[in-house]
Amino acid sequence: MTTLTDDTKEIDELNTEFIAAVGAHDVGRLDAFFAEDFVSTNPDGSFLARADYLALVPALPTVNNLKGDDVTIRVFDDFAIVHTHISWVAHDGTPGHGRFTDDYAKRDGRWQCVSAHVTTYPHHPVANPSVL
């Protein structure tokens, strides 16, 4: 049986909160969540500093059922890397999928997200749904 460390549990909770905050366009929660030196690499290749990312959040497309799964958390003392698969449904019913990698640093006893890299997958219809 695998036992999660306290740090891993805390980071897993933060990861869940991060996904919920993005889905809700909750700038206030993200503001508290990100380190002052947070940077993001977005699916289009743009590189945004913290303030620019937070300014973008209200304009993100509204999606349904945003969720994360297939989470891997690796903790290295006061640094951690989180890999997560995300999925959602656009308003037109089109499913979306992607992955993100977030980097956390423990500063003054608190885990903060210092970097995010998001990749989205193009939608590929399943040729034979009976194989699922």
Segments from the language model and where they lie:
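A beta-strand edge to alpha-helix "cap/lid" segment located at domain peripheries
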Residues: 2-32, 37-132
